[in-house]
Amino acid sequence: RAREWRALDSLFFEDTTVESKKLFENILQDDNSILKDFSIATLKLQKYRNNLEEEINELMELIAPNITALTGSLLGARLIALAKGIENLALMPGSRIQLLGSKKAFFKNKKNKLLPPKHGAIYQHPLIKGAPWWQRGKISRSLGSKIALASKIDFFSKKYIGDKLNEDFNNRVEKIHQQYPNAPKKMRIIRRNKR
């Protein structure tokens, strides 16, 4: 947006390949106060976000190292927040962890008589997000069960086996990729009218 405003302000600004941080720093040198204020606010927001991510990384390494090794600190923290605590996450089955964060989609699909969602917040995991659509449900189920195991270990025993869990999960994903390389043929479901 700052690039668009700058382009409107100056017809000579045609370099659209300028990185965002450099763009904001260039705008700070100008005397247009609106763009300057916007650039300052954006740079502060980026700095705040980076500091927040570092803080979450440190806390997750202390609180839930196995979950962090399996999902990453940001996704792990989001799952703990959705479960309202690591204790609740540790007591959940893998199938519920798989669907954490999909409440709106679940009830929307139920209302419209569609199939329920296969994954919730764990869709943000790169191995699920990057997988073909027909493999995502299987990978989500596997990740949900591994997160359930990791959260139980983090809450009850504090023993670190995150690397082994991550290796097992990656092996399972490879097996899914090999077992289901092609998309299944879509079947048309014929429903009979109830009379």
Regions found by a protein language model. Give the residues of each.
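A residue-level signal for conserved active-site and pocket-lining positions in enzyme catalytic cores
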Residues: 2-4, 147, 169
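Extended compositionally biased segments used for macromolecular assembly or nucleic-acid engagement
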Residues: 3-27
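Generic structural signal for hydrophobic core residues of well-folded globular domains
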Residues: 5-9, 42, 83, 150-154, ...
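Helix-hairpin-helix/helix-loop-helix acidic hairpins
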Residues: 26-74
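Extended alpha-helical surfaces
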Residues: 33, 37, 44, 66, ...
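Long, well-ordered mid-to-C-terminal structural blocks that present hydrophobic/aromatic surfaces
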Residues: 57-89, 94-98
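Phosphate-backbone recognition surface of nucleic-acid-processing proteins
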Residues: 81-156
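Low-complexity, acidic/Ser/Thr- and charged residue-rich accessory regions of DNA metabolism proteins
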Residues: 133-137, 141, 150-195
